[in-house]
A protein has these predicted regions:
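Exported/extracytosolic protein signature
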Residues: 1-190
Length: 190
C-alpha cells in the first residue's frame, strides 16, 4: 500500500500559514502472482508459466500489458535470454473463461497487450517457454523469470524461479553389427 501526504498553505496580507499535514493511504486494487509448473529444468525442456492478475476493486481494469523478460540476465557487456517463448502457446482467461482479445509479441521480452481484469475478478495468462542454450547449467543455478504488468494505477511485478536439475540427463544407445550372425561368427557391440 502506498501512502500520501498533503499540506495546505494560506497566504493573506503578506502572511503565510501552513495547515497540519494529513496522510492518506492508496489501496492497491490489482495484485499479480507468477508460478512455473515443475521443479527443475534441463536444456530443451518446455516450461509452463502461469501469471494471475487479481482485481479486488469495484471497477474493471482494461488495457493492461504483461511483459515477461524470459529470464534475461547480463553476461559480459550483453544480455542473454535463457528462455524462448513457444509460439501460439499463450492462453488468456478472464474469470476462468477463455478470452481472445490479447495480442502477443514473442520478443524477447514476451509482450501481451489488451489484458482486461473484471471487477472483483481475475485474468490468468498461461504460456510456455523452452529452455535454450543460454540457461545456466552449473550446480545450484536457476532461471529467475520476471513478469511486469503495466497500465493500471501501479506497475506490478511477479517472479518465478526454477532450478537446474541436479541429475544429469543421460541417454545410452547400443548397436550390434552385424545383426545376423552365423554360428561361431563374430559380432561387435557399440
Amino acid at each position: 500500500m502506498a501512502a500520501f501526504t498533503n499540506t495546505a498553505t494560506l497566504t493573506y496580507n503578506n502572511q503565510t500559514r501552513n495547515s497540519n499535514i494529513v496522510t492518506g493511504e492508496i489501496l492497491e486494487v490489482l495484485t499479480a502472482t507468477k508460478n512455473v509448473i515443475g521443479a527443475n529444468y534441463h536444456v530443451g525442456d518446455t516450461l509452463t508459466y502461469v501469471v494471475t492478475v487479481v482485481n479486488s476493486g469495484a471497477t474493471a481494469i482494461t488495457g493492461l500489458t504483461l511483459s515477461d523478460d524470459l529470464g534475461a540476465y547480463t553476461f559480459g557487456t550483453g544480455t542473454l535470454t535463457p528462455l524462448d517463448y513457444v509460439e501460439d502457446s499463450l492462453r488468456y482467461y478472464t474469470n476462468g473463461t477463455l478470452a481472445t482479445t490479447a495480442t502477443v509479441t514473442a520478443g524477447p521480452p514476451l509482450t501481451v497487450t489488451g489484458i482486461s481484469v473484471p471487477a472483483g475478478g481475475d485474468a490468468t495468462i498461461i504460456y510456455q517457454a523452452k529452455v535454450n542454450e543460454f540457461a545456466p547449467l552449473t550446480n545450484e543455478s536457476s532461471v529467475k523469470n520476471t513478469a511486469t504488468v503495466t497500465g493500471g494505477a501501479q506497475t506490478l511485478t511477479a517472479e518465478a524461479t526454477i532450478a537446474v536439475s541436479a541429475e544429469p540427463e543421460l541417454t545410452i544407445t547400443k548397436t550390434l553389427c552385424p545383426q545376423t550372425v552365423v554360428e561361431d561368427g563374430q559380432i561387435t557391440y557399440t
